[in-house]
């Protein structure tokens, strides 16, 4: 459960991301594909080369979903219900992949905002991404 302090930390961190959210989403996806090659199996139709339009496009979708989640931290299940359905029933993404992407998002944010990436911010973002992952995998049961 996200505390009030966690929610404030997440909001502050995401505000720093600003207009680069889509770029960071794409970078996190590239990190995931390079670090965890099995994740590529869900994107057989994508050009996974560095800077590809498809990875950038999906990175923007990831970032938009996270921006939506940041704006609805008090109702993540409601805010992410359609996305949860999509990933569980249509795409059938292995739930572990959300954890892998979460890790890559943390690394990406830390690399771009090292001064702001304090232990408290890190912990709050980690809890937030875990909460989002839990909601996205809730329909698998």
Swiss-Prot record:
Heme b binds at residue 87. The modification Phosphoserine is found at residues 3, 35, 102, 124, 131, 138. GO terms for cellular component: blood microparticle; haptoglobin-hemoglobin complex; hemoglobin complex. It comes from the Eukaryota. The modification Phosphotyrosine is found at residue 24. The keyword Iron applies. It holds the Pfam family Globin. CDD domains: Hb-alpha-like. InterPro entries: Globin, Globin-like_sf, Globin/Proto, Hemoglobin_a-typ, Hemoglobin_oxygen_transport, Hemoglobin_pi. Keywords: Acetylation, Heme, Iron, Metal-binding, Oxygen transport, Phosphoprotein, Transport. The modification N6-acetyllysine is found at residue 16. Residues 1-141 form the Globin domain. PROSITE patterns: GLOBIN. GO terms for molecular function: haptoglobin binding; heme binding; iron ion binding; organic acid binding; oxygen binding; oxygen carrier activity; peroxidase activity. The keyword Phosphoprotein applies. GO terms for biological process: hydrogen peroxide catabolic process. O2 binds at residue 58. Red blood cells. The modification N6-succinyllysine is found at residues 7, 11, 16, 40. The modification Phosphothreonine is found at residues 108, 134, 137. Heterotetramer of two alpha chains and two beta chains. Involved in oxygen transport from the lung to the various peripheral tissues. Belongs to the globin family. This is Hemoglobin subunit alpha. It comes from Macrotus californicus.
């Amino acid at each position: 459960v996200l505390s009030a302090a966690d929610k404030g930390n997440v909001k502050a961190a995401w505000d720093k991301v600003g207009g680069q959210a889509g770029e960071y989403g794409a970078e996190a996806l590239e990190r995931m594909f390079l670090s965890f090659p099995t994740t590529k199996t869900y994107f057989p139709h994508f050009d996974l080369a560095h800077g590809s339009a498809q990875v950038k496009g999906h990175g923007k979708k990831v970032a938009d979903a996270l921006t939506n989640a940041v704006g609805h931290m008090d109702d993540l299940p409601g805010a992410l219900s359609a996305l949860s359905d999509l990933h569980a029933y249509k795409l059938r993404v292995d739930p572990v992949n959300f954890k892998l992407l979460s890790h890559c998002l943390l690394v990406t944010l830390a690399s771009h905002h090292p001064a702001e990436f304090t232990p408290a911010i890190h912990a709050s973002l980690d809890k937030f991404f875990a909460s989002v992952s839990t909601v996205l995998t809730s329909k698998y049961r």
